[in-house]
Amino acid sequence: MWVLQALAIMLSIQAGTLDLVETPPVVGNLPVAMPVPLNLPVGGLSPPVLKGPVNHQMLPPKRPVPPPKGGKCAPAARYFLSSDKLHDYLMSTLPPQIEDMVKCDEVNLEGMLADVLNTVESSDLLSLLDGISLLKGGEGGGLGIGGLLGNEGNGDSSKPSSGSKATGGLGQLIPGGIPGTEALGGLLNLGGDKSSGKGLLNGDGLSKIKKPLEDAVENVSGIKDAIQEKVNEVVPDGVKEPLNDVLKMDIKDTLLELKVGQVTLDDMEINMEANGMQVLSMLTATIDGKGVLGPVISLLQFEAKMDVMTTIAVASNNTQCVNLDAQDTHMHVKEMKIQLVETVTGKVPLPVPLPLDQIIPAIVTAKINENLEKSNSCAIVLNDFNNCKNNTGLFSYQVNTARISPKGLVILYCAKANIGNKTVPVPGGRLPPDPKNASIAVTISSTTLKTLVKEVAKNSSVQMDGLEAQITHIAFASQENNTLRVVYKVDITKNGEHFATGETKLFISHGSKISNSTLIPDVKLIRSEHSVVPPEAKEEVEGILSEVGKVAWSNFNETYKKMNIPVGVSSHTLKNSDVKLMKSIDLQAAS
């Protein structure tokens, strides 16, 4: 009995091996590959258990289990757009939208800055400056005293400041650091979590930041004289005395109105990733202070260095259309400066802007990100990438998958043929790769052409001279010079009985083009060849064989003229590109 049990186990293992290498339906006509050996554990198979009955549930089903209904079909067409084209589109589309987003009323950058200035008890200009940055030595200082931008050593001001550096200058003024600094945790996070910064200004979040800011203003008085002395070293003698009054000026009492003026894109970096695109925009925004009172200053200007990080992914409505979607956007105010732009006498008392303490842009960052998240009118919209019009014709295409990779955008489509009054599913197949260095490419599976020809053949039966002819088999082959060879067999009956079998070869030249998502057909019948079995019936069936060839070619030619291709992306289409007939009989065009 144990011999039978061991044999049953061996059979189950062998059956499992066959299931693993079962040929998929889409490649059923290809040569059958040799079975792939099982990946067995290093220690070998466990010895069979000989006690008890055989577990018949281990045996695989005799027939392959069909895929569940509603599953995705195999792709029958593909559209490709290179990463260079995507980069060019974003570089031309994003800058004006990002600049408008910074100016957007619902983001309210100027209002948030005013709110922050109103949270401190002592808001004279000298108290709001970044004292550590102004006093620090090294290169890059705008006043010639180093460290003007508030970065450590030779730090690059164009790079986003980390959370520790955002409060570093102020923290050094307060023994033991800034109390409540933990409230800034995650404030400057530019990616991933869409809710970054959310809730920071609600509850006790703002109070934890406001308190150290007020404490810092009180403690900074110890170095005010040193700051003022350093600033006076770089200004003309004629404005030193008025400047002292300016530095003691209370911003809250003098600013009547703030408004975002000019927004300039300094640089933009686009990274293509496996699941989308990351866009980092570096900007400079000026915020003008109008209506300033006093005998010296008539116009103030704040300058904000900002980063805007945007995540862009593919959005599909599971029909024919694929678009780009700006899914996540975060703003980061890296630093803020104040510029004394204009005086009553027309003189500019300071040659460069003075940096504000870095806790101020940190709080502004949190506030504007909350506003952006709640906004309905400040979002980035990329709907001009694809107009998403329905594409009707001989074939209906539906998006199978769409993804972005470092190479570019790839859209795979399922297809159905609309022939006569019925819809015929087009079986998918393995598609050839896109041409190297292609910017745009469209590939149509050979299964679409085969589906078209087979459906045409069903409507090409002929009756004449007491004979009836019907096409029973079709084969395809690609020839040189973009030529397609179609071979079909014809069953000829006489008086209801089989009389002869004819074979016809059609040689068709293919010179079609694709332009603006439209196939411009150009197919010509070069020649045809006929043969008959048995040969003695040739003379009697030559007429009907010739007629079948004429009807089949006419039907194919008229139907092929209605053939359409997937649109892909309407803003990036092929222009008068030749359609190449591949050896696999797939159709491909590229530019």
Curated annotation (Swiss-Prot):
One of its GO terms (molecular function) is lipid binding. N-glycosylated. The N-glycans consist mainly of complex sialylated and fucosylated biantennary structures. The lineage of its organism: Eukaryota, Metazoa, Chordata, Craniata, Vertebrata. One of its GO terms (cellular component) is extracellular region. The gene is Bpifb9a. InterPro entries: Lipid-bd_serum_glycop_N (IPR017942), Vomeromodulin (IPR034433). It comes from the Eukaryota. Glycans are attached at residues 421, 516. This is Vomeromodulin. Expressed in lung. Not detected in other tissues tested (at protein level). Residues 151-172 are annotated as: Disordered. Residues 1-18 form the signal peptide.
